[in-house]
């Protein structure tokens, strides 16, 4: 599972959404 920093959600295309 990919986890982003500080409670952000990983996007299916890459990157994070906060």
Swiss-Prot record:
It is found in: Secreted. One of its GO terms (molecular function) is toxin activity. The modification Cysteine amide is found at residue 18. Keywords: Amidation, Disulfide bond, Secreted, Toxin. This is U1-poneritoxin-Ae1c. GO terms for cellular component: extracellular region. The keyword Disulfide bond applies. Disulfide bonds join 4-16, 8-18. Expressed by the venom gland. Belongs to the poneritoxin-Ae1 family.
């Amino acid at each position: 599972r990919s986890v982003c920093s500080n409670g952000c959600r990983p996007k299916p295309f890459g990157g994070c959404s906060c």
